[in-house]
Curated annotation (Swiss-Prot):
Residue intervals of the Response regulatory domain: 21-149
This protein's GO CC annotations: nucleus
A Pfam short name: Response_reg
Organism in which the protein naturally occurs: Arabidopsis thaliana (Mouse-ear cress)
4-aspartylphosphate modified-residue sites: D82
Reported function: Functions as a response regulator involved in His-to-Asp phosphorelay signal transduction system. Phosphorylation of the Asp residue in the receiver domain activates the ability of the protein to promote the transcription of target genes. Type-A response regulators seem to act as negative regulators of the cytokinin signaling.
Recorded GO MF terms: phosphorelay response regulator activity
Keyword Transport: no
Gene that this sequence comes from: ARR17
PROSITE patterns xref list: RESPONSE_REGULATORY
Disulfide bridge positions per record: none
Protein name as catalogued: Two-component response regulator ARR17
Entry keyword set: Cytokinin signaling pathway, Nucleus, Phosphoprotein, Transcription, Transcription regulation, Two-component regulatory system
């Protein structure tokens, strides 16, 4: 599946370290800080948002009056979002991103503390790149970066 991306492989990481900008979305401050810290340890640039609506604003999708130029300035290579958030779920955020002509190619990873097969299948069928269980671990980020590298080549 991820050939050459074992736990000791630095070759997968080196070509993406400079460019991977991740938008991390979670309503829980502790979970959000944990994801941010792990991503930064993995040499990712990280922007955080406390809910789906804030994430949409950052991505330039929050206000219909905004121009698409804002999206280009704040380009992200990956969105990692919690599934269960008030106001807008991670699944709803996923759908909005995949409906956007400018963002539909951005991979979205859904995080959840609950391992519910129907939820996982629904997210994957709607375009999620991966569904991961909380808490996020450093090894998860390394696997994810290798997976993204394989998808881009």
């Amino acid at each position: 599946m991820n050939k050459g991306c074992g736990s000791g492989s630095d070759s997968c990481l080196s070509s993406m370290e400079e460019e991977l900008h991740v938008l991390a979305v979670d309503d829980n401050l502790i979970d959000r800080k944990l994801v941010e810290r792990i991503l930064k340890i993995s040499s990712c640039k990280v922007t955080t948002a406390e809910n789906g609506l804030r994430a949409l604003e950052y991505l330039g999708l929050g206000d219909p009056q905004q121009t698409d130029s804002l999206t280009n300035v704040m380009k992200v290579n990956l969105i990692i979002t919690d599934y269960c958030m008030p106001g807008m779920t991670g699944f709803e955020l996923l759908k909005k991103v995949k409906e956007s002509s400018n963002l539909k190619e951005v991979p979205v990873v859904i995080l959840s503390s609950e391992n519910i097969p129907t939820r996982i299948n629904k997210c994957l069928a709607s375009g999620a790149q991966m569904f991961m269980q909380k808490p996020l671990k450093l090894s998860d980020v390394e696997k994810l970066k290798c997976h993204l590298l394989n998808c881009r080549s």
